[in-house]
Structures are given as C-alpha cells and as structure tokens.
Amino acid sequence: MSAEELTAFQREITEGIPAQLPEPSLRSTGVSHAPVRKDILTEKEKVLALRNALRYFPADQHSELAPEFAAELRQYGRIYMYRLRPSYAMHARPIEAYPAVSQQAASIMLMIQNNLDPAVAQHPEELITYGGNGGVFQNWAQYRLTMQYLSQMTEEQTLVMYSGHPMGVFPSHADAPRVVVTNGMVIPNYSKPDDWERMNALGVSQYGQMTAGSYMYIGPQGIVHGTTITVLNAVRMNDKTGSGPAGKLFVTAGLGGMSGAQPKAGNIAGVVSVTAEVNSEAAYKRHEQGWVDHVIEDVHELTEKVQASVAVKEAVSYAYLGNVVDVWEAFDRAGLFVDLGSDQTSLHNPWAGGYYPAGLGFEEANEMMARDPERFAVHVKESLRRHAAAVNRHTAKGTYFFDYGNAFLLEASRSGADVMNEDGTGFRYPSYVQDIMGPMCFDYGFGPFRWVCTSGKPEDLELTDTLACEVLERLMQEAPADIRQQMDDNIRWIKGAKANKLVVGSQARILYADAQGRMEIAKAFNDAIAAGQLAGPVVLGRDHHDVSGTDSPFRETSNIYDGSAFTADMAVQNFAGDAFRGATWISLHNGGGVGWGEVMNGGFGMLIDGSADAERRLKSMLHWDVNNGIARRSWARNEGAEWAIRRAMEQEPRLKVTMPAHADDALIQRA
C-alpha cells in the first residue's frame, strides 16, 4: 500500500458516516450475494424499518436516502445501505495501518475487516460472513460508525455493540473489554425464525452465527481441524479391519464459509470425499482457493470418478455442483458403498437459503423462497424426507452417518422424515458431538483455540506454529494416557499446517488444545513478542463451538444427559467470566450452528503484546474459559470431564469444583 493509499484508507476510517453522501452504488458482480429475504413486514412495519434506517443520517439527507432505502427493502427484503460501502479494498491489513489510539481497538478493526474480506466472507456486500445469515453488521452505516469509534477510543473506554449497532463508547478501565458484543438477544418467547426475519428486516436485531458477529472468523481453516478430527475418529470407530482411512468414502454437502472445510479435511484425513454444493460461485471459489481438488457437474461422471478413486485408495476431494440428494440416490443405484456420511448445509436457516431442495434449480429456489415462501417450505420438507430416505438406504448397508450439528436431523424430523429411533424419544443417528467431539475432546478440555498474527507476515505465523509445536511436544512427554491420542493428533496437525496451505485471509491458525496447552502456547507467543522475535502482537481466540462457549442441545451439549442440555448457564457464565478476567472483546449470541432460538453461544478475543499485563490476563482468562465447561460436563457425570477437572484442581490449588456423587441404578429403581 502506497503512502497515498494508506492516508486515504485512514481518512475514510476516521470520518465514519461521511458528511457528504457518496454516490449511489449498485451491487457488485462476481461476488456471491445473499438471497432475497422473504417479504414478512406489514406496511406499517415497512415504514418503521425505513424510519429506523434513516436515524443514522441527518434530516437534510433523508429526502435523498428514503426512496433508495425503501427500494432496497422492496427488492432485497433488507436495507443494506449499499451506497455506504467503503471505497477501499476490504481485507485484513497489518495492525499499524489502522488509525487508532488504542492498539487493542486496532486489532478489532483488523478482525472485522477480515470477516468481510470477499475471499473470506460468504456474502460480503450484505455483511454476511458465513451460514447464509451470519452477519457482522446489519448495514454499512453500522460498519462505518463502528470503525470510527474504534479509531477514536482509548483503553479507558468500552464500545457496546447491540446486534451490529454501535450503541456508543462508555467510560471503563484498562482491564475491561474494549468491546462488548451481543447478537440476537431477544425475549425467549420471541425467538422463532420468523421473529428473526421480522426484527432483522426492521434493523433491530441480527443473527451473528458464532464467529461472524464476534469478529473471530478465520476462513474455512476455522473448522478444518475439528472436521479432520471428526473424520479421523469416525474412521477409527468404524474401521473393523484396521485398514485405516485410505479408500474410505465420505459423502456430505456444503462448500460455504464453514462447510467449505470439508474437502480439505477429507484430504488431510486421507479419505475420498464428495461434497455437494448448489451454488456455483461457492464451489468454484473453494476450488480456486485449493480447498477442493475437482468440481464435477454430472452425477454419472462423479460416480465413475469416485469409484476409480476408491479402488486405488486415493486421498482426493470432489465437489459436485448440484444437490446432495441426487448424490446419495445415484450412489445407491450404482451400489457404491459410502463409509461415512454427514451434511453441513445451513439447516439452521432452512427457509431462507440454508437448504436448497432437490428438484429446484439454484436461481429458481432463490426466487421462490422470496416470492412464495410457503410453497418453498413445502419443497424443502419434501426434499428432507427424500434426503433422509436415501441416507437410510445407505446406513442399512453399513454406512456410518452422523449429524454435523447443522440441525439436519432436527429439521428432517420436523418435516416428517424417518429419522427417529425406535421408541421415538431421540434420533436414529448420533450427532458428531455425542459420538466423537464431546467424549473425545470437549470433556477433556480440548477445543478450537486459534490465533492471528497482526503483523500480517507469513513468517510470524510460521514461528508461532513452531512455538506451539514445541509446547505440545514438551507437554506430550508427561501427558497421561487418557489424552495422549488427542495430543498426538494435534502435534501432527500443527506440523503439517503450513504444507496444508490453510490460510485464507489473515495470517491465522487453528489448533485444538486443552487449558494447559492454550495457556502455555499463549505465554510462548507473548515471550516471543517481548523478545522481538515476532514482528507484531497476536490476537488469541477460539470458535464458540468449544468446551465452554456454547449451550446447544443438538450440537455442543448433545452429550449432556442429566437434563440440563436445554439450559444456557454455561455460555452466559463464560461470557461474564471472560469479561472480568482480561478479554479484549467478548460476545454473546442467540443462535449459531443449529439456529436462532436453539442455541446460546459466546466467544472472546484477546490481544497479547509481550507485556506482563498480557501474561497475567491470558493465564487468568484462558484457564477459566476452558475449565468452566469441564466443570459443567463433570457435574453432568461425564467420565472424561470428571477426570479432567480433578486433574485441573491438582494443577491449580485455587480451583475448587463441586463433584457429583454417583447413585446406584438398582437403588434408584427400588425407591
């Protein structure tokens, strides 16, 4: 970036909403756009939506903006304020490029821009990062105002974000979070999908997914490690011959922001993978980024190529440009055995672009969901029944199918599909958390720790990989047998991270680690910054999909069996606890993964800068951020969590956790 470009960039950041309006702007071609949202507002509510949008602007601009915003609402179902899109390219820059009084605030600006980078975001011009509706902001005025506040604030202030809206900067103190984010916090009785549609159209609430609305998304890498762990362990659990992953076939769907990790994970795990995707822009975007090997548009050609790859035990990934139902049915007709099956379509949002029904083309479906949502819903339900029936035919032959926490089984059951167990009390297939991620990772405190090198230098990321590997190898020498497999998998992951070319957007890394691993890795980074070995500070974070961050009965807490799976104390306590233990920013969201009204989840970001204060904060906050969830899982009588929290108490004498007594089953039956 030249000096002139940098000056112009910084000027546009600091001016916020410009006093002189930019010229009207059309949507760009060549990028994916959000589908038209359904027309849900009454005429009176449409007037209110327009009034709400205009309050960001002085009254003398209303006559120019009102018809434009009204047209956006009619055409797209939302008011995005396209004319306020910034003139500069949207991507994460080195932290020193951001005009800021507070370095912590500058790091948040970097993370926000990464979430909206067209190489990273699903629908960048609608401010959607992933999942079809996972928003960073509701409109571009909110983006501009937020960036202005961040450029001005000091470390004695906190910016408060209400569902994308910057409510204001309030006095606080240096150890308080710089930003507190909430997304979709609504009265529980008003948390149905149509409530989101209405409130989002009014501009008063948004669905932040997980790392979208919390400024912590790092591209598909953010889920690829967990997906690799899931695929590897699914193979191990079902490998009766001991032949390993080579030649195993994995069928799934979705090449969006999160789901796009699946083919890369399949390659790393060593299987043949087929991932169906109806959106050509998404499929070819992942192919261009090197996240999927081949894109095939004919299901017969796909079948032949997959049969050949399975025969030679090739580790290869195929994207099928079409509907996954067609894949399941074609493979059934061809007698092609599928070892593993799942789905990562955005079924948390089935009626507004999260799931495209079989039998409808992509554009046809987009038009119908906006113009005739009731008819579209009928097609979705029919497709889910057909989808489940095809999966059932494969599982009858021995396929291992698991729900990937995207509400597939939930929405299929609501559509009347044959997905319930024999007594009708649960689903016939497990979620991946029930079988794999919960008992093998979360109960032991392992989850998706991540970091971003704010210098933007690949060599900084390479050094952090080396430091993290050194820490894990040292901890591995004394690791108990209960966690040696997890440690070994994570060491292999970090050693291969550079070769696997995972970076899309910022210089970031994902690594599953437990509390001890996270704290020691973070301290190693902080020491390297202090010693001048790293060129800039590091942002620490995690996915909300973690040990403590999310209460979700159909995903993260689906292996909680004491009746508390539908409670949300853990996620809310985590949000509050991170706030006063040193997080730079914190977030709490309604929804995420399984859907609005189905989940409560939260996350954090922490800037470490080589200081003693940073070391104090990282030790305090990271310890709590993991052990809170282990304690809850232990109280639910999860065996691995009981072991893990006892070990944590031995390592930290100040930690005292209430442990469960186990009642005798026969005694209870006699009572």
What residue spans do the PLM features occupy?
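Long, compositionally biased, glycine/small-hydrophobic-enriched stretches that function as flexible linkers
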Residues: 1-201, 205-218, 373-524, 528-541, ...
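Solvent-exposed alpha-helices and their adjacent loops that cap or buttress functional pockets
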Residues: 152-154, 170-174, 189-190, 240-245, ...
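Catalytic or ion-translocation cores adjacent to nucleophile or general acid/base/metal-coordination motifs
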Residues: 208-232, 236, 246-249, 255-313, ...
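Short catalytic-loop micro-motif centered on adjacent basic/acidic residues
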Residues: 249-252, 316-320, 402
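Short, solvent-exposed amphipathic alpha-helical segments in soluble enzyme
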Residues: 267-269, 332-337, 417-420, 529-530, ...
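Residue-level detector of anion-binding/catalytic polar loops
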Residues: 272, 337, 400
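Glycine-rich beta-alpha junction loops
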Residues: 280, 322-325, 344-349, 405-411, ...
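Active-site/ligand-binding-proximal alpha/beta "capping" segment
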Residues: 317-345, 352
